[in-house]
């Protein structure tokens, strides 16, 4: 089958590989019907994901049809349309039982697909722990609609969940790409007092104005002053940084009030340094 493969830093190639087979009784084989590119794939290409293994098929955002299942898989069957979770997790270790599935201690736990084991930029993919990592797609939901569920929407949901958002809060979201919009949708479920989205792309700003007219928007250059003028305590109560640039990492702290919650949703190509306290709000 054709696969898109991480060869070395800066180099991906379309390569021929054998179809995957069941290795563990908890595995499933999924025929990929639709996949998308994540910015994390670009971080792998840039060499900024240390655990990424050269030679693996990249891709962790996909939907498909279950082709085969191991003997211990009970939640899905061949022929089911499914989303594939970016995280593979055993569901049994300490971290899984406490909801921190990204830290699953199994060798295939956490972000394995498309990073440490072959992922979904291929015709077929083997999914470990299929009962945890596959979800059936309802008949009325298209593959295109479901494609966001396994990673981008789940990332936004998790970010909103851990940010302890309260109804009296001013929430700043930095970045309005696909993950930023999904984060916005999940933050809206928390009903904070106001939501501000910082974005430089005019098309993305227009999209927010058309679909979510109640949301405030601001450019990065004006963001710090705008947030201070449109918040109750000299800065945002909660900041979610989804853009992933060095400048936006710094901006997150500049816009946060004292004792705010800053949630880093993005990945970065290099280590970031917290700004000096004197230079922020």
Question: How would you name each of these model-derived features?
Answer:
Residues 40-46:
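Cytochrome P450 core scaffold surrounding the K-helix E-X-X-R motif
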Residues 92-174:
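NAD(P)H dinucleotide-binding glycine-rich loop of Rossmann-like/cofactor-binding domains
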Residues 136-225:
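Mid-domain Rossmann-like dinucleotide-binding core that forms the NAD(H)/NADP(H) cofactor-binding site
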Residues 163, 188, 205-279:
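Glycine-rich cofactor phosphate-binding loops and adjacent beta1-alpha1 units
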Residues 7, 19-20, 53-59, 113-118, ...:
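Short Gly/Pro-enriched turn/cap motifs at secondary-structure boundaries
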Residues 81, 170, 260-261:
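Short glycine-centered segments of the SAM/dcSAM-binding site in methyltransferase folds
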Residues 75-78, 167, 258:
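Short, flexible surface segments
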Residues 20-35, 48-97, 138-141:
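Glycine-rich beta-strand-centered segment in the early N-terminal region that forms part
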């Amino acid at each position: 089958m054709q696969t898109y493969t991480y060869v070395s830093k800066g180099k991906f190639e379309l390569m021929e590989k054998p179809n995957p087979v069941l290795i563990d009784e908890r595995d499933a084989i999924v025929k990929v019907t639709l996949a998308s590119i994540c910015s994390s794939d670009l971080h792998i290409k840039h060499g900024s994901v240390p655990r990424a293994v050269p030679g693996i098929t990249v891709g962790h955002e996909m939907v498909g049809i279950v082709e085969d299942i191991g003997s211990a898989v009970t939640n899905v069957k061949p022929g089911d349309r499914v989303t594939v979770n970016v995280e593979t997790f055993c569901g049994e270790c300490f971290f899984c039982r406490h909801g921190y599935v990204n830290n699953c201690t199994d060798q295939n736990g956490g972000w394995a697909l498309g990073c440490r084991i072959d992922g979904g930029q291929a015709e077929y993919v083997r999914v470990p722990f299929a009962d945890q990592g596959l979800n059936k797609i309802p008949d009325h939901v298209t593959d295109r609609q479901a494609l966001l569920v396994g990673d981008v929407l789940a990332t936004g949901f998790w970010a909103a969940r851990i940010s302890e958002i309260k109804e009296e809060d001013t929430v700043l979201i930095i970045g309005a790409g696909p993950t930023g919009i999904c984060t916005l949708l999940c933050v809206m479920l928390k009903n904070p007092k106001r939501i501000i989205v910082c974005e430089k792309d005019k098309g993305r700003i227009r999209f927010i104005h058309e679909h979510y007219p109640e949301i405030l928007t601001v450019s990065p250059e004006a963001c710090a002053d705008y947030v201070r003028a449109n918040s109750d305590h000299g800065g945002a109560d909660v900041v979610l940084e989804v853009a992933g640039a060095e400048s936006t990492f710094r901006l997150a702290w500049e816009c946060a009030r004292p004792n705010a919650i800053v949630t880093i949703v993005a990945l970065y190509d290099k280590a970031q340094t917290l700004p000096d306290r004197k230079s922020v709000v």
